[in-house]
Amino acid sequence: ATILVSVAASPLPKRQVLKNLGVPKSTYYRWLRRPRLDDRPGGGPTPWNRLSPPEEQAVLEVARRSPELSCRQLAAWITDNRGFSVSESTVYRILRREGLVKSAEMQLKADKEYHRKTTSPHQMWATDASYFKVIGWGYYYLVTVMDDYSRFVLAHKLQRDMTSDSFIEVVQDAVDKTGMTEVPVADRTSLLSDNGSGYVSRAFGDYLHLVGIRHILATPYHPQTNGKLERYHQTIKQDVNQLPYEVPTDLEAANAAFVSYYNYQRYHMALGNVTPADVLNGRRAGILQRRREVQFQTIERRRRYNRTLRELATASS
């Protein structure tokens, strides 16, 4: 019963919760089909974990106010901000019933990652560039530096080309913002990039040597790839390219707005449905602990609520 409760109330996908608990899917669904004693009074089974009307209204209110959030993101946001826990699947059912479900979103997965996993912020940064078109101006290149562990975008700028000078400018911005040159050389970050001419140039190598940052080059067709940053660039393009831009400053402003949203507001599934800023600043463990507490409190409150409904139905029959 405890496992069924945990799976039903978790904001995470059912498959992920079962994997974390070490319970096979076949076993879970066999348990789910068993009649429960608590369900028998009053005739047919009544879901013990049914949301109360105020909880359903809260789900709809948040969904209508923030239509850009997916069901997964809504479930996490509600758990963090509304004092009760709700699963992604429950959010989906409520929105579908009300005709608020968006068309299926394309799930873009990161490519293979660098073979050595980072375990804390600033162990390794990644940098890459992606092109955007400005009407009448041609192509510009968004150069980004991202922290590998937290996926926090440390620096970004729209550049006219992909020369070493353009790359150095953005990396230096990340160095300045983090105070990386004040860190002992042995503890400084490394930088992962592809083999673009600007990155493999002597000027770029000399710059990294000057600031004490070790350069890691991603070998083609090798697991040392830049998948996280490539995935990020796909995501920002999906958002920013919904509108045409006639001057570079408008595109730069749109990119900056998305970066702020991505870093501080967007729940990232690969990070445990917290934001990159939460991970960068060491808040993830506390947030996940609070969610577990909210989940437990919600389970107990919802169990009492639905038991009362069953007792009232039995008494009136």
Residue ranges of predicted features:
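Short, amphipathic alpha-helical "recognition" segments used to contact nucleic acids or chromatin
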Residues: 1-12, 56-65
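Short alpha-helical "recognition helix" segments of helix-turn-helix
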Residues: 14-21, 74, 78
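Short coil turns linking two alpha-helices in DNA-binding domains
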Residues: 23-24, 87
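Basic, flexible linker segments flanking DNA-binding modules
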Residues: 32-124, 223, 280-284
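Mobile-element integrase/transposase regions
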Residues: 84-85, 89-146, 152, 165-188, ...
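Acidic/histidine-rich, metal-coordinating catalytic segments
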Residues: 171, 180-200, 221, 226, ...
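RNase H-like polynucleotidyl transferase catalytic core
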Residues: 188-195, 209-228, 242-248
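C-terminal domain-tail junction helix/linker
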Residues: 209-213, 234-317
